[in-house]
Amino acid sequence: MDNDKTIVAFLDLLGFSELTKTNPETAYLNACQVVNRIRSKYQDQIKVENSNEFKDWSSEVKKHSRRSAITTFEHCIVFSDSLGIGANATDAALFVEQLSRLLVDIADEQLQNFKGKIPEQITDIPNQRAKYVDTDKNIRHPSAFPILFRGGLSIGSKSEILFQPVIQIEEKGLTPQGLSIIGIPYVEAVQLEKFGKGPRLFCSSQLAKILQKELDTEKEIIKQVDENVYELIWTYYAVKALSLHPNPKANIDNAIKNLLTPVLNLAGYYWKEGAVVIHYLEFLKLIWEGILLYAHIHNYSEEQIQKVKMDMTNCWYKNQCKFFFSETET
């Protein structure tokens, strides 16, 4: 029975270790931004569901509201640049949508800083959505840097995955505080996270079977990439989440503008750094695939899908011409 099983996710923040060396201030603020986003999602949903208006909402409106929340997160642990999350397997379909939308929300805040051409030093780009007052009482914007996670998801019985108190030593005494995760399914999730490059989500074959059944018309977002490894095309939910327009074309156009464009800029900037650019190239493939899946699931004709491909290709071409021509000129 699925209600006896727990989904466990392990997510790692890409580039964080290197960022702590080159720009520790931004690394710290990005980590804080992740925590703040999770906290605000949790608190916002409590406020919504405790409001007088909520009880009068239709079931469809309530369902839509919860898609953007984190109501399925039974456990969520933030440790340094990683996240550990647990959810009941009966909520599998809603959990992957909520997780995907969380990743979209976190990524979008920073990606909007890269919609224009990136200067010679990426650290010269300020994060326009964040500011603080320094010791001289000047308002400052920290450097912008993408917040992208790669993750692994697995599943096991509740007895196999244990969220238990952390044992800490304080003043030479043991005190249980916070949570830790142990269990073979968690170890499997950690191993799955390392399967590929870029901000991707990989899951076990056991979890994939449950998702393919529960996702119904959206089951195509789960694809097999190895014998026992599947990938969740979470960028499909990015198209849904970034615009929320009733017209699918408007959502696709918005994803091309606000997701594809900044990642193209980042790929162009890191083009000569093979170890870094591979992550953005994989992200570009993932965005492309997510947009086409969205079009297909929304019953686009073959002619309409070809038009979407043309729009993405034109965006790709214009961006790369802009980058390479400017490189030639310099």
Predicted regions and their residues:
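Short, glycine/acidic-rich beta->alpha junctions
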Residues: 145, 183-184
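A short glycine-enriched loop-to-beta-strand structural element that forms part of the catalytic core
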Residues: 73-82, 118-137, 142-163
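Short, glycine/acidic-rich hinge or "gate" loops at secondary-structure transitions
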Residues: 48-60, 116-131, 210-211
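Flexible, glycine/charge-rich interdomain/linker segments that couple
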Residues: 163-180, 198-214
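Intrinsically disordered, glycine/charged-rich C-terminal tails and inter-domain linkers
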Residues: 198-330
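Catalytic NTP-binding/metal-coordinating core of nucleotidyl cyclase/transferase enzymes
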Residues: 1-114
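A broadly used, surface-exposed interaction patch
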Residues: 85, 89-138, 165, 169-172
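Catalytic/regulatory signature loops of cyclic-dinucleotide turnover enzymes
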Residues: 155, 184-207
